[in-house]
């Protein structure tokens, strides 16, 4: 971009769009280095605004992290929705699980922002981040393709989410190779988890139905 256009873009930050610019710039930093790479002072310098300017939009770093994490979940949800709705011989749960594995490894900085920091856990109920994260969970529950029987779907969804997170974090650390992974690929391991989850849910639902009669 020519320098003259850059200066014009930076000047507009004082007229309302600095918030979006901060979120996008912070997102890029997280993409490269995870949540720890996000620094408000560095972002202000990068965007060419005064050090106090970001605080007109975000009370502190945590508030900025919350906005960036919400955006990450929204982008992730778009990916998941497209995959779940796309006709395929794979089950919806398999598509969800494999997409999560790929996202976690290929975009690990963003994944760690979403799942390996305290930001999501501290998000107030009803906040943009909370709503975006709950949409991810809803997509996982939908991908189970099972009727509602008590809270069995939700419980199995949380088990699956926890298992997937474990695989991503172990794989990211290089701990799922060779004999440590039983000689199977990460994708095969995740597919095993998918099949076991579907079987466990089916057994639990049949037991619940028998107990109801």
Kindly label every feature range from the protein language model.
Residues 81-82, 114-122, 177-181:
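Short linear capping/connector segments at secondary-structure termini
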